[in-house]
Amino acid sequence: MSEQALLSLQNIIVKREENIILNGASLVVQPGEFVYLIGRVGSGKSTLLKSIYADLPISEGEGRFGDFDLKHIKRKQIPFLRRELGIIFQDFQLLTDRSVVKNLEFVLRATGWKDKKLIQKRISEVLEQVGLESKGYKMPHELSGGEQQRIVISRALLNKPKMILADEPTGNLDPITGEQIITLLREIGDAGTSILMSTHNYAHVKKFPARIVKVEGGKLQEMQLKQDL
């Protein structure tokens, strides 16, 4: 295990309602690394992501993210862990009753930001980063699916996370829009943020090659692009 690893999971066991989903799973992710997480529906991809952001406990084994001990993390530490993680879901989960800017402002204030000028500055920065600097006044329903997912990505970037966990981020998008989202995530990764992305879209994996880890039989297996995905 590298001392510089951002994420290190060693032989972890994770359960959901007493069912063992991950059984002896191990994974190491370095700073700035892009990793695809593949596997069948129900194989444990989402369970793995939930264990990293402390939504599901690690029953056995060892887990570390940065300075956090994921197995023994205390409830009061979880908000601080999640500030270092950006989380992206396929179903957007934007607040439908407020504008893009108000969605982003809500997250910043909920994570301790108070200075109005700094809040406005950070919102402008992330909207520019995802190419939607002119859409801040829009309501979520006025945006396309691709634009909504870009807003979700901008929300994940607000606190300058060390890693982004993306759970099927292109699942509800058409192929062209999905490719645009992958391109954006790759750019974010190239800028130094680690990306751990679960996907069923092997066309994306082949077109935008990166490290591949397969979830199967409760364990994690390194895959090569030339292997049968």
Cite the ranges covered by each PLM segment.
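Conserved ABC transporter NBD signature motif
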Residues: 61-69
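Helix-to-loop junction immediately C-terminal to a conserved catalytic motif
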Residues: 53
